[in-house]
Amino acid sequence: MAQNDIGIDLGTTTIIIAQEGKGVVLNQPSVVAMDTRKKTVLEAGDKALAMVGRTPNYISAIFPLKDGVISDHTMTRELICRFVKQVYSSHMVKPRVAVCVPAAITGIESDAVVEAVVAAGARQVYLIDEPIAAALGSGIDITQPEGRMIIDLS
């Protein structure tokens, strides 16, 4: 991976972004605060979550991911764009991005993830099944012909 390439774990409750040589550079809740009157996003992540229950009725908290897949395409794109732009500066080459997705994701859902990440400024997008990413992240050599079990306790 090049220095500005990033990996994204698009979780239902949390988005984590890691960068080569730096480790985790962003860990934020998967939520946006939207002004429903103006149809504009006010905040994302921690700042949006802090607004829950403390704002007028016309400001809604939207959790755009359900079961690890996109349920609100527009809000997911906004969330990813904001977070990717926080991680890399505009003078850098556009990053290649690896995104963890559920193994059972449909073609339409995977297309939506790729489109959202490209809209955020990615040069190339690679989708990696979550079990494969978990195995690689825990140091398992997935090229070896041996059985391993990975349990997701979340």
Write out the residue ranges for each language-model feature.
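Nucleotide/phosphate-binding catalytic cleft detector across ATP-hydrolyzing
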Residues: 1-153
